[in-house]
Swiss-Prot record:
Protein name: RNA exonuclease 3
Keyword Amino-acid biosynthesis: no
EC number(s) per entry: 3.1.-.-
Pfam family, one: RNase_T
One GO term (biological process): rRNA 3'-end processing
Functional summary from the UniProt entry: 3' to 5' exoribonuclease required for proper 3' end maturation of MRP RNA and of the U5L snRNA.
Domain Exonuclease: 243-389
Name of the gene encoding the protein in the UniProt record: REX3
Length: 404
């Protein structure tokens, strides 16, 4: 059995990892029996088993309901000979699995660039959806509000202490938890995965298991972001029609939150077209290396933001005809200071509730691929996001040759 077959980590776990793991193995074996007549590989079935199990886990309110729902699934997978459209969980048709079945025993239906472009354009998000999800859209230029950007004080993004922005380079003590707290259904409290402390703990560590000698902040409004550098519009750049997957790494500076690495990958060839560490405009406060993977920036050899902008905002890379793919792409476009309206965002495409699935979990759920096990890598993340979209429209992640 494949080493990739493990349950997807969830914010709210209906059951412990070991029990979910055992049930997932049983589901995989049932799928092997149900699809024995197809040409699907074990990897295909592992991916399907993972998707089905996490779907049930997310739609089960307790460990007991999870076990019951999984017993129904284990029974009906064989009963209906793998036809998932006939299976109901909690009285509802099993959603979320059927679109992925094309990879089992069938050839790719999309073999030309024109067909792929047609499918991709159908995934482009409406401007209202973009604005609702935190994207800075071009229309915001005409309704600016300087109230936030002129504030002298800001809450520290890590410890929530209010501090004076102009004092950001002065040393102080910031105590915080580097990882977001997770709700535990069994204990009914929140736990910090970085250290195991809980919100109802009386230990001093509940205040934070890590310290830093500066507070940090992150401006998010159009006005605040423009204090660092103005936005550019891709509408002003004509060029080739292309599809690009991108990801940025960011760091905290004296001006807020800035891009320090950018990777751009071509959708059709899988080739990396741009991958550079970039000098931020402000003075570096924290490179956030545990997450960004960037440990130093050579102020002599690394391109400045302006130099990088002149390269990636061009007729052969990002232009008005480009379709941009990313996960939580509003964060990337905001630090790149770009207005762009042809966007495919996997965080929005795969959101099932008000909470968005992480790229780490999405890559494992859809691709059975482990990413972000340590420091983040913008190249790895850009490729994973691109491959998730390929699977979404029925293309193999390894496909890089196309018929005319």
């Amino acid at each position: 059995m494949g080493s990739l077959l493990r349950p997807v980590d969830l914010v709210n776990q209906p059951l412990g990892f070991q029990e979910r793991y055992k049930i997932l193995q049983k589901l995989f074996k049932q799928l092997q029996k149900a699809y024995a007549h197809t040409k699907g590989t074990n990897i295909d079935l592992e991916r399907l088993a993972t998707r089905l199990e996490v779907h049930v886990a997310k739609n089960s309110l307790s460990g007991q309901s999870y076990k019951f729902n999984m017993s129904i699934l284990l029974r009906d997978v064989l009963k209906y000979k793998g036809d998932l459209s006939k299976i109901k969980i909690n009285g509802r048709p099993l959603k979320g699995a059927k679109p992925h079945l094309s990879s089992i025993g069938n050839a790719n239906s999309i073999t030309t660039k024109s067909k792929a472009m047609e499918a991709l354009k159908a995934l482009i998000l409406d401007s209202k959806v973009l604005e609702k999800n935190g994207y800075i859209v071009k229309e915001m230029q005409n309704k600016t509000n300087d109230d936030n950007s002129t504030q002298l004080y800001a809450p520290c993004l890590r410890c929530s202490s209010n501090f004076k922005k102009t004092d950001i380079m002065e040393k102080t003590l910031c105590r915080y938890h580097p990882l977001k707290r997770i709700y535990n259904r069994d204990t009914k409290n929140h736990q910090y995965p970085c250290c195991g402390e809980t919100t109802d703990s009386v230990s001093f560590l509940r205040l934070g298991c890590k310290t830093f000698f500066h507070h940090v902040f992150r401006g998010e409004s159009y006005d605040e972001l423009c204090k660092i550098s103005k936005f550019s519009s891709t509408d002003d750049i004509d060029g080739v029609e292309n599809v690009l997957s991108l990801d940025c790494e960011m760091a905290f500076t004296s001006l807020g939150y800035e891009m320090i690495r950018l990777t751009i990958v071509d959708f059709f060839t899988g080739k990396t077209l741009f991958d550079h560490v970039i000098q931020p405009i402000g003075d570096i406060v924290d490179l956030n290396s545990d997450f960004s993977g960037v440990h130093e920036i050579d102020r002599t050899n690394c391109p400045t933001y302006k130099e990088a902008l002149d390269v990636f905002l061009s007729e052969n890379l990002i232009n008005k005809n480009s379709i941009l793919i990313g996960h939580g792409l509003e964060n990337d476009l905001n630090v790149m200071r770009l207005f762009h309206n042809k966007v495919i965002d996997t965080a929005i495409l795969y959101s099932r509730t008000k909470f968005k699935v992480s790229l780490k979990n999405l890559a494992f759920e859809v691709l059975s691929r482990k990413i972000q096990n340590g420091e983040h890598d913008s190249s790895q993340d850009a490729i994973a996001t691109m491959d998730v979209v390929k699977v979404k429209i029925g293309i193999s992640p390894s496909q890089n040759k196309w018929e005319k």
